[in-house]
């Protein structure tokens, strides 16, 4: 007999690691998570979906506008099956379920990332001018019936020379 199992970055670093840390915590008030990735590593479709290379006005219309709606409108889009959440949207739901919590609300906000000087993108075959979107931060906030808030953010963008992939999580509570 043979068992083959597979897993990925989200499963380990956004899920199992956090639930293990939470299990060792006496009291949790808030879970804060942030993960960064370079859109240059994942191709043109991902770079464009993250708004890389757009002006801030274009970003607002093409990327952020879908999150600047009422909770009722968002729920209707979710119910229709047409909502396109960020990676963290599903992670928050998974963590809430894994921790035995109950969601009372969940929101997402896509915020453009910029840089103070021009950055070249090989993927987009362009120089992204200072102040244009290099990508985005998608911030997902989940409130639970039990009083625990999850605030997670995935940052996908064209990196400057000093930027790098990172995964940072904080559990606020006791111990802090």
Predicted regions and their residues:
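Beta-strand-loop-alpha-helix segment that lines the small-molecule cofactor/substrate pocket
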Residues: 1-7
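Gly/Ser/Thr-rich loops at beta-strand to alpha-helix junctions
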Residues: 8-15, 38
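Alpha-helical support elements that line or immediately flank enzyme active sites
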Residues: 12-24
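Active-site-lining helix/loop region of Rossmann-like oxidoreductase modules
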Residues: 21-172
